[in-house]
Amino acid sequence: MNICIIGGRLQGTEACYLAKACGMKSILIDIDPEVPAGGLADRFAAGDLVKEDPAVIEAFRSADIILPANENDELLAKICELAERYGKPLAFDPEAYEITKSKIKSDRLFIENGIPCPKYYPDGRLPYVMKPSDGSGSTGVKKISTEEELSEALKNKAEGDIIQEYLEGPSYSIEVIGIPGNYRTYTITEVHVDKGYDCYMITSPVELPE
C-alpha cells in the first residue's frame, strides 16, 4: 500500500517511520525540500499542494490513502478537496479536528463527559498557565507563578488566550483511531519535553502511577 503523508516535520517523520515499520510505502509531500522526514520517505515530492504544483498532484494521485501530518488550516482544506476530487481515502476527520485543535472546545467535551481537566481562571489557584486556545507545540505558552505575573498576564491577554491551572507531572498521550461506530484506543505513551525542542521524544510502554 502507498500512503501519502502530507507534512514532513515531527508528525510526518513519525508517520514515515511507522509506515516503513508496517511495510507500507510512504510518499511524502511538503513545500520545504529540507524537512526532516524527507530522508525517511520512500518518495519525496517537494512543492506547493495548495497551488496544485503538478509534481505534488501526481504524487498525491499515486497514493492509495492520504494521511495529513500538519496543522495548517489552508492546507488541510485543500487536502480534503483533493481527496474528494480524486476519490482517495482520507485518514482525517475535519469535524473531529475542529474540536481537538481548540482547547476550549475539547475541554468542554471533557467536562460534558465527566473527564477531569484543569480549572479555568478565576477558579483554581496559582500557578496558572496562559496559552492560545488553538495551536500546539507550546507556542505562546507562559507559566504564571505569582500574583504579579497573573496581573500582568490578565492585562496582556490576547483574544483567544486561556488561563488554566498549571499541573505538575509527566505528560501522557493516547491515540484513538477508527470510523463512526468502530473506534479503538492504542498504547499510552509518555511525552518528553524540554525548553529547547518542546517534544523531543515519545516513549512506550509506560508505567502509570496509581
Question: Where in this protein do the model-derived segments appear?
Answer:
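Glycine-rich phosphate-binding loop signature in dinucleotide/nucleotide-binding domains
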Residues: 58-63, 124, 157-158
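A conserved helix-loop-beta module that forms one wall/lid of the active-site cleft
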Residues: 84-152
